[in-house]
Amino acid sequence: MSGEVSHRAGFVAEEAVARIYERADRPVTARRWRGAAGEIDLIARDGAEVIFIEVKKSKSHAAAAARLSRRQMERIYGAASEFLAGEPLGQLTASRFDVALVDGMGRIEIIENAFAA
């Protein structure tokens, strides 16, 4: 996949995942939020809880899951920490890290609490 096609496919996958969260009354409050440590694909809220969502797209859900590296998780943690610093409760804010896997057919599997800080 070329860079532009890959970028567009990632954007479409993120929008589809955002719609799932929105339909579940978990409003998406930020898309592609960038801090000094890295980028978070989507940030949603479930009441007072902040949900950091990493979207992975590949041929299969297993292949998508395999694309999430330890190094990438560390960058997500760092960016999430920066984001939480701006919350009223700071690092004490309830939060979780979800991973949304999107396969080649556009099917979405969401893994809540996929990894922990």
Curated annotation (Swiss-Prot):
Any Pfam family the entry gives = UPF0102
Which Gene Ontology terms cover its molecular function? nucleic acid binding
Q: Which InterPro entries match?
A: Restrct_endonuc-II-like, tRNA_endonuc-like_dom_sf, UPF0102_YraN-like
Origin, by domain of life?
Answer: Bacteria
Task: Supply the HAMAP family for this chain.
Answer: UPF0102
Q: What protein family does this chain belong to?
A: Belongs to the UPF0102 family.
Q: What is this protein called?
A: UPF0102 protein Rsph17025_0472
